[in-house]
Protein backbone atom coordinates (compact mmCIF):
# COMPACT_ATOMS: atom_id res chain seq x y z
CA UNK A 1 0.00 0.00 0.00
CA UNK A 2 0.98 3.65 -0.37
CA UNK A 3 1.28 4.06 3.39
CA UNK A 4 4.27 1.69 3.48
CA UNK A 5 5.84 2.80 0.18
CA UNK A 6 6.51 6.43 1.08
CA UNK A 7 9.89 7.81 2.11
CA UNK A 8 10.32 8.52 5.79
CA UNK A 9 13.02 11.17 6.08
CA UNK A 10 12.46 11.41 9.83
CA UNK A 11 14.18 8.03 10.29
CA UNK A 12 17.56 9.72 9.76
CA UNK A 13 16.94 11.96 12.76
CA UNK A 14 16.12 9.08 15.12
CA UNK A 15 19.47 8.43 16.85
CA UNK A 16 18.28 5.06 18.19
CA UNK A 17 18.33 3.77 14.62
CA UNK A 18 21.32 3.53 12.26
CA UNK A 19 19.89 5.57 9.38
CA UNK A 20 22.08 8.58 10.22
CA UNK A 21 25.13 6.47 9.31
CA UNK A 22 23.54 5.35 6.05
CA UNK A 23 22.73 8.96 5.18
CA UNK A 24 26.30 10.10 5.91
CA UNK A 25 27.67 7.22 3.82
CA UNK A 26 25.30 8.08 0.95
CA UNK A 27 26.33 11.75 0.93
CA UNK A 28 30.02 10.87 1.05
CA UNK A 29 29.73 8.33 -1.79
CA UNK A 30 28.09 10.94 -4.04
CA UNK A 31 30.82 13.44 -3.12
CA UNK A 32 33.54 10.83 -3.73
CA UNK A 33 32.12 9.80 -7.11
CA UNK A 34 31.88 13.43 -8.24
CA UNK A 35 35.41 14.36 -7.10
CA UNK A 36 37.00 11.37 -8.81
CA UNK A 37 34.80 11.44 -11.93
CA UNK A 38 34.10 7.76 -11.45
CA UNK A 39 30.87 7.76 -13.42
CA UNK A 40 31.94 10.22 -16.13
CA UNK A 41 35.10 8.49 -17.29
CA UNK A 42 34.61 5.87 -19.95
CA UNK A 43 37.65 3.86 -18.90
CA UNK A 44 36.89 0.20 -18.48
CA UNK A 45 36.86 -1.65 -15.19
CA UNK A 46 39.71 -4.11 -14.82
CA UNK A 47 38.99 -7.18 -12.69
CA UNK A 48 41.96 -7.87 -10.46
CA UNK A 49 40.71 -10.58 -8.10
CA UNK A 50 37.41 -12.37 -7.50
CA UNK A 51 36.89 -15.09 -4.88
CA UNK A 52 33.32 -16.38 -4.63
CA UNK A 53 34.05 -18.58 -1.62
CA UNK A 54 35.50 -15.75 0.45
CA UNK A 55 33.05 -13.23 -1.07
CA UNK A 56 35.76 -10.83 -2.31
CA UNK A 57 35.84 -8.58 -5.36
CA UNK A 58 38.80 -6.38 -6.28
CA UNK A 59 38.78 -4.22 -9.39
CA UNK A 60 40.59 -1.21 -10.78
CA UNK A 61 39.26 1.88 -12.53
CA UNK A 62 41.51 4.79 -13.44
CA UNK A 63 44.08 5.09 -10.63
CA UNK A 64 41.75 3.62 -8.02
CA UNK A 65 41.56 0.07 -6.68
CA UNK A 66 38.25 -0.96 -5.10
CA UNK A 67 38.28 -3.81 -2.57
CA UNK A 68 34.91 -5.22 -1.53
CA UNK A 69 34.62 -7.81 1.24
CA UNK A 70 31.00 -8.98 1.29
CA UNK A 71 31.58 -11.77 3.81
CA UNK A 72 29.31 -11.31 6.85
CA UNK A 73 31.85 -12.58 9.40
CA UNK A 74 35.30 -13.20 7.90
CA UNK A 75 37.99 -10.53 7.83
CA UNK A 76 41.21 -11.22 5.94
CA UNK A 77 44.41 -9.96 7.53
CA UNK A 78 46.66 -10.89 4.60
CA UNK A 79 44.49 -10.43 1.53
CA UNK A 80 46.85 -10.57 -1.43
CA UNK A 81 45.72 -9.59 -4.92
CA UNK A 82 47.47 -8.72 -8.20
CA UNK A 83 47.67 -5.06 -9.24
CA UNK A 84 49.00 -5.36 -12.82
CA UNK A 85 51.54 -2.61 -12.02
CA UNK A 86 54.42 -1.78 -9.67
CA UNK A 87 53.00 1.35 -8.05
CA UNK A 88 52.33 2.32 -4.45
CA UNK A 89 48.83 2.99 -3.13
CA UNK A 90 47.20 4.61 -0.14
CA UNK A 91 43.69 4.15 1.27
CA UNK A 92 41.55 7.21 0.52
CA UNK A 93 38.22 5.71 1.53
CA UNK A 94 36.94 2.88 3.66
CA UNK A 95 33.40 2.12 4.70
CA UNK A 96 34.54 1.03 8.17
CA UNK A 97 34.96 4.61 9.44
CA UNK A 98 33.11 5.42 12.65
CA UNK A 99 31.19 8.23 10.91
CA UNK A 100 29.56 5.47 8.82
CA UNK A 101 28.85 3.31 11.89
CA UNK A 102 32.03 1.26 11.42
CA UNK A 103 34.86 0.28 13.74
CA UNK A 104 37.90 2.10 12.22
CA UNK A 105 39.73 -1.17 11.54
CA UNK A 106 41.61 0.13 8.47
CA UNK A 107 44.61 2.42 8.88
CA UNK A 108 44.70 5.42 6.56
CA UNK A 109 48.43 6.00 7.19
CA UNK A 110 49.80 2.88 5.52
CA UNK A 111 51.33 3.04 2.04
CA UNK A 112 50.79 -0.24 0.20
CA UNK A 113 53.59 -1.18 -2.19
CA UNK A 114 52.94 -3.48 -5.10
CA UNK A 115 55.64 -6.15 -4.98
CA UNK A 116 56.28 -9.36 -6.90
CA UNK A 117 54.38 -12.32 -5.48
CA UNK A 118 55.31 -15.89 -6.41
CA UNK A 119 51.74 -17.19 -5.94
CA UNK A 120 50.34 -14.94 -8.67
CA UNK A 121 53.66 -14.54 -10.52
CA UNK A 122 53.05 -10.80 -10.75
CA UNK A 123 53.00 -7.65 -8.61
CA UNK A 124 50.59 -7.80 -5.69
CA UNK A 125 49.41 -5.81 -2.69
CA UNK A 126 48.72 -7.35 0.70
CA UNK A 127 46.09 -5.60 2.80
CA UNK A 128 43.79 -6.12 5.78
CA UNK A 129 40.19 -6.41 4.60
CA UNK A 130 37.58 -6.38 7.40
CA UNK A 131 34.25 -8.15 6.92
CA UNK A 132 31.43 -6.21 5.24
CA UNK A 133 33.60 -3.32 4.05
CA UNK A 134 34.78 -1.48 0.98
CA UNK A 135 38.25 0.06 0.72
CA UNK A 136 39.42 2.34 -2.08
CA UNK A 137 43.14 2.72 -2.74
CA UNK A 138 44.58 5.52 -4.86
CA UNK A 139 47.85 5.32 -6.78
CA UNK A 140 50.51 7.65 -5.37
Predicted regions and their residues:
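Carbohydrate-interacting/catalytic domains
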Residues: 1-140
Amino acid sequence: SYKHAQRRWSLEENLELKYEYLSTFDRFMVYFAQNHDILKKSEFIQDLFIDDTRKLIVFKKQDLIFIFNFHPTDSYSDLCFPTKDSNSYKAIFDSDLDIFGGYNRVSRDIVYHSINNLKFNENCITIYSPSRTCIVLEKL
